[in-house]
């Protein structure tokens, strides 16, 4: 039940707060919600999202957590690293403040705790010595590379 509560809370935060942040930022720069919704999906986005979805369909909960973690935790890490950076152009300041915020950092802590507890519950105290842990790390690393490609779309 605890896993379901944390998962539901995280999904709620992502859909109702994080997505709205991105919609609002785009709107500030002249990109409407309609424009966003009608934009053709790029290959990098397809590769990343389908990888995560496929693991959700064919893998187990640990696989899915391993694939989702780079996104949730990566944004938090980037936000923290940029927290004290004051760009000349404030275009991304709201984004930085959101992902560096205590609220988003709490989301990251909750997700990290969910991951640790989920492995512990399913695989025991020595879960880091299991084949499943090795596989989870491979999934995490692959998802991280796909996340990097996703970010690099902006540079095209």
Where do the language-model regions lie?
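Short loop-to-alpha-helix "cap/lid" segments that border enzyme active sites
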Residues: 108-123
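Hydrophobic residues within well-ordered, non-membrane alpha-helices that form the packing/core
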Residues: 26, 76, 115-119, 151
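Short, charged/polar, low-complexity loop and linker segments
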Residues: 52-54, 121-130
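Structural helix-adjacent loops and short alpha-helical linkers that scaffold large soluble proteins
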Residues: 1-4, 130
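Active-site-proximal alpha-helical scaffolds that flank and shape metal-associated catalytic sites
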Residues: 5-107, 145
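Acidic, carboxylate-rich catalytic segments that either coordinate divalent cations
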Residues: 130, 134-156
